[in-house]
């Protein structure tokens, strides 16, 4: 067993022997301040990774656009098919120029040779490549099948209805392509620590998230040296922004954090800054 596999296998073990965790309302004060600064709703939840206990939450059962955070769930569904012998990570998928959609920095470079399922998941999570996500959605049967996968996990809230990039439209009061912070946090925890996926697939999923290259201005910008984070960000229309993450000190994750916002007129930089400040408060009061 590799060191990384050992780390993920012992996530519940280490967490069980940690000192009790206590909620700190100071972080919620910052979440509410972010709402004021952005002029928009902000949803927040913080779960203990081992027990699933909610440590703090704000608007945990209000719907927010998922945006690209759905790509972690998508690759979880792909990995479940791999575990069941219905898919192979090494299978190569070929596609054409007509398949390319807006923001496809990886797939646009491989029109000639195609990409493997493993490479597509890596591109979808680490670079948020939209064509990679659409190609992977095709392998599982489309958005409705991802929703069905989530329902089978016990998540009857999260739903995907459309493809990239239309799913980022974020129309107010439109339930399409949305989740709730509580539902997303619980589902992410199941994917990373539950028995739904094999140990190898859980490790692969967290490795992809740990290698995320496009979430630097968010929670990662607030992390002290030595902290662990595996995350996936999302951005959408109407001032929408979000991030889902597993993080913790001492090089291992111990909490799940989900943050979503929508309806702001603020710039992307300002949305990023507010999420980073929430992260800084979380870490300060850990």
From Swiss-Prot:
<dbReference type="GO" id="GO:0008800">
    <property type="term" value="F:beta-lactamase activity"/>
</dbReference>
<dbReference type="InterPro" id="IPR000871">
    <property type="entry name" value="Beta-lactam_class-A"/>
</dbReference>
<feature type="disulfide bond">
    <location>
        <begin position="75"/>
        <end position="121"/>
    </location>
</feature>
<keyword id="KW-1015">Disulfide bond</keyword>
<keyword id="KW-0378">Hydrolase</keyword>
<feature type="binding site">
    <location>
        <begin position="232"/>
        <end position="234"/>
    </location>
    <ligand>
        <name>substrate</name>
    </ligand>
</feature>
<dbReference type="GO" id="GO:0046677">
    <property type="term" value="P:response to antibiotic"/>
</dbReference>
<feature type="signal peptide">
    <location>
        <begin position="1"/>
        <end position="23"/>
    </location>
</feature>
<dbReference type="InterPro" id="IPR045155">
    <property type="entry name" value="Beta-lactam_cat"/>
</dbReference>
<dbReference type="GO" id="GO:0030655">
    <property type="term" value="P:beta-lactam antibiotic catabolic process"/>
</dbReference>
<protein>
    <recommendedName>
        <fullName>Beta-lactamase TEM</fullName>
        <ecNumber>3.5.2.6</ecNumber>
    </recommendedName>
</protein>
<keyword id="KW-0614">Plasmid</keyword>
<feature type="active site" description="Acyl-ester intermediate">
    <location>
        <position position="68"/>
    </location>
</feature>
<comment type="function">
    <text>TEM-type are the most prevalent beta-lactamases in enterobacteria; they hydrolyze the beta-lactam bond in susceptible beta-lactam antibiotics, thus conferring resistance to penicillins and cephalosporins. TEM-3 and TEM-4 are capable of hydrolyzing cefotaxime and ceftazidime. TEM-5 is capable of hydrolyzing ceftazidime. TEM-6 is capable of hydrolyzing ceftazidime and aztreonam. TEM-8/CAZ-2, TEM-16/CAZ-7 and TEM-24/CAZ-6 are markedly active against ceftazidime. IRT-4 shows resistance to beta-lactamase inhibitors.</text>
</comment>
<dbReference type="InterPro" id="IPR012338">
    <property type="entry name" value="Beta-lactam/transpept-like"/>
</dbReference>
<keyword id="KW-0732">Signal</keyword>
<dbReference type="InterPro" id="IPR023650">
    <property type="entry name" value="Beta-lactam_class-A_AS"/>
</dbReference>
<feature type="active site" description="Proton acceptor">
    <location>
        <position position="166"/>
    </location>
</feature>
<keyword id="KW-0046">Antibiotic resistance</keyword>
<keyword id="KW-0814">Transposable element</keyword>
<comment type="similarity">
    <text>Belongs to the class-A beta-lactamase family.</text>
</comment>
<dbReference type="Pfam" id="PF13354">
    <property type="entry name" value="Beta-lactamase2"/>
</dbReference>
């Amino acid at each position: 067993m590799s060191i990384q596999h050992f780390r993920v296998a012992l996530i519940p073990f280490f967490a069980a022997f940690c000192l009790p965790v206590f909620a700190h309302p100071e972080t919620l004060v910052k979440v509410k301040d972010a709402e004021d600064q952005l002029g928009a709703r902000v949803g927040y939840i913080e779960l203990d990774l081992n027990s699933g206990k909610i440590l703090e939450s704000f608007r945990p059962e209000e719907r927010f656009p998922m945006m690209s955070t759905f790509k972690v769930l998508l690759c979880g569904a792909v990995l479940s098919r791999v575990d069941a012998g219905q898919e192979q990570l090494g299978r190569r998928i070929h596609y054409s120029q007509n398949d390319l959609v807006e923001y496809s920095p990886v797939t646009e470079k491989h029109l000639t040779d195609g990409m493997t399922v493993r490479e597509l998941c890596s591109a979808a999570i680490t670079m948020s490549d939209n064509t990679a996500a659409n190609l992977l959605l095709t392998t599982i049967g489309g958005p409705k099948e991802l929703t069905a996968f989530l329902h089978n996990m016990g998540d009857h809230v999260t739903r995907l209805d459309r493809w990239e990039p239309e799913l980022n439209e974020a129309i107010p009061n439109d339930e399409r392509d949305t989740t709730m912070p509580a539902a997303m946090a619980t589902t992410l925890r199941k994917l990373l620590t539950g028995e739904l996926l094999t140990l190898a697939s859980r490790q692969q999923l967290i490795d992809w998230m740990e290698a995320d290259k496009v979430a630097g201005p968010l929670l990662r910008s607030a992390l002290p040296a030595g902290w662990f984070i595996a995350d996936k960000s999302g951005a959408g229309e109407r001032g929408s922004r979000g991030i889902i993450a597993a993080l913790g000190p001492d090089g291992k994750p111990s909490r799940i954090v989900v943050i979503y916002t929508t309806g702001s007129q603020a710039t992307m930089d300002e949305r990023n800054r507010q999420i980073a400040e929430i992260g800084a408060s979380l870490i300060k009061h850990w």
